[in-house]
Amino acid sequence: MKRTPHLLAIQSHVVFGHAGNSAAVFPMQRVGVNVWPLNTVQFSNHTQYGQWAGEVLAPHRIPELVEGIAAIGELGNCDAVLSGYLGSAAQGRAILSGIERIKAVNPKALYLCDPVMGHPEKGCSVPAEVSDFLLEEAAAVADFMCPNQLELDSFSGRKPQSLFDCLAMARALLARGPKAVLVKHLDYPGKPADGFEMLLVTAEGSWHLRRPLLAFPRQPVGVGDLTSGLFLARVLLGDNLVAAFEFTAAAVHEVLLETQACASYELQLVRAQDRIAHPRVKFEATPISL
């Protein structure tokens, strides 16, 4: 019997709705990965509602929880770590400490860093120290980085003027250490208004993917968290990077179609679960180069 992969997901959690782990855990489980959620934040709901209740996990608790898993002899079964929104650089360093501990018992364990800073339409939402930490420290450790356009702009210190400018910016981030950079949402002058575009960049090549852009009265939150989680899950399940990229784009599109059909602000993960596991649509990633 083939072994089921195990993944430690270190990010925020909301009681109501879907953001952070609340957007990523169930879809990763639905495609066949055992997920260990370590919630860095527990809020009543995501912050785009404008009000919320809850608390943030103190940074020192993260390595404590990792050590607790080690104490029962299970840490070596961790095949990958996913990290998302960081409230501080201290929280980020605590995550890197946990990753170091995991790699000590499983050197093959992968790390995907989702460098959450904000949304292109909503602006940056993290302190400068977090942006600096992600670029100067996390990128050197991560196997995969999954920024959106705002985050890629922040790392690059500029805005792109073309698709090929986006590619150059992603390659500059790749040079900092990751094996692959997945840009979850491209935005550049001249981009077709009816398309949603993504980019995958590795040392071996670069691939561009375009799917239809769906309209919403209010953009659902958690799409980036869903994207990063599914990409890492599919890699753990044996997909090559391009196949994982294509699967992720299709599965996320299926969720958005169901969300749109329900006229919902929150992602309709449960209603779309069968199509997350087996997307009906397919989008082809096409090779591009400078």
UniProtKB/Swiss-Prot annotation:
Q: Which cofactor does it need?
A: Mg(2+)
Q: What class of enzyme is it?
A: transferase
Q: Does the UniProt entry include the keyword Nucleus?
A: no
Which GO-annotated molecular functions does the record name?
ATP binding; magnesium ion binding; pyridoxal kinase activity
Q: Binding of ATP: at which residues?
A: 114, 151, 184, 211-214
Ligand binding (substrate) = 12, 47-48, 225
Q: What does this protein do?
A: Pyridoxal kinase involved in the salvage pathway of pyridoxal 5'-phosphate (PLP). Catalyzes the phosphorylation of pyridoxal to PLP.
Protein name, as recorded: Pyridoxal kinase PdxY
The source organism is: Pseudomonas fluorescens (strain Pf0-1)
Q: What is the lineage of its organism?
A: Bacteria, Pseudomonadati, Pseudomonadota, Gammaproteobacteria, Pseudomonadales
